[in-house]
Amino acid sequence: MAELTTLARPYAKAAFEHAQAHQQLASWSAMLGLAAAVSQDDTMQRVLKAPRLTSAEKASTFIEVCGDKFDAQAQNFIHVAAENDRLLLLPEISALFDLYKAEQEKSVDVDVTSAFALNQEQQDKLAKVLSARLGREVRLHAAEDASLIGGVVIRAGDLVIDGSIRGKLANLAEALKS
């Protein structure tokens, strides 16, 4: 995974810098999201891994499948990625681009998993508290997992706050073993 990220980083950075310079962050994010989804399709994976096809043929096929969703710069990006055999890295490139975009916009995606469904008021309060703590606009994504027993697990980037009963029981069990 770290190797894929290392290979994808220069492409994501170049795409981000281009999109930022041309004030097209949203459209490039959408384009890279589409490209990532297309590259993960089983049929497209076989095309991209086909040794008989040239990089130009792979890029052309890829662009043809995406239709008119790509402008000239995006098509050029796909050709450059194909020439360097990096089309299979499009999911990582897209994810990194979105991280750069979130950093630029001072926002962060936060995944909150709770034992029970959070109502809108609870989600709003949690988003406000997290926004103050992280110093960023928070985009909250709520999910349920009954195995937590109670409490919540919050994930924002590499920050994880485990306030679940399951987590506390696991910590207690570990302490008792020591």
From Swiss-Prot:
SUPFAM superfamilies: N-terminal domain of the delta subunit of the F1F0-ATP synthase (SSF47928). Transmembrane segments: none annotated. One of its GO terms (molecular function) is proton-transporting ATP synthase activity, rotational mechanism. It comes from the Bacteria. Its main location: membrane. Keywords: ATP synthesis, Cell inner membrane, Cell membrane, CF(1), Hydrogen ion transport, Ion transport, Membrane, Transport. GO terms for cellular component: plasma membrane; proton-transporting ATP synthase complex. It is a peripheral membrane protein. It is found in: Cell inner membrane. The keyword Ion transport applies. Belongs to the ATPase delta chain family. F(1)F(0) ATP synthase produces ATP from ADP in the presence of a proton or sodium gradient. F-type ATPases consist of two structural domains, F(1) containing the extramembraneous catalytic core and F(0) containing the membrane proton channel, linked together by a central stalk and a peripheral stalk. During catalysis, ATP synthesis in the catalytic domain of F(1) is coupled via a rotary mechanism of the central stalk subunits to proton translocation. F-type ATPases have 2 components, F(1) - the catalytic core - and F(0) - the membrane proton channel. F(1) has five subunits: alpha(3), beta(3), gamma(1), delta(1), epsilon(1). F(0) has three main subunits: a(1), b(2) and c(10-14). The alpha and beta chains form an alternating ring which encloses part of the gamma chain. F(1) is attached to F(0) by a central stalk formed by the gamma and epsilon chains, while a peripheral stalk is formed by the delta and b chains. HAMAP family: ATP_synth_delta_bact. This is ATP synthase subunit delta. It comes from Pseudomonas fluorescens (strain ATCC BAA-477 / NRRL B-23932 / Pf-5). The lineage of its organism: Bacteria, Pseudomonadati, Pseudomonadota, Gammaproteobacteria, Pseudomonadales.
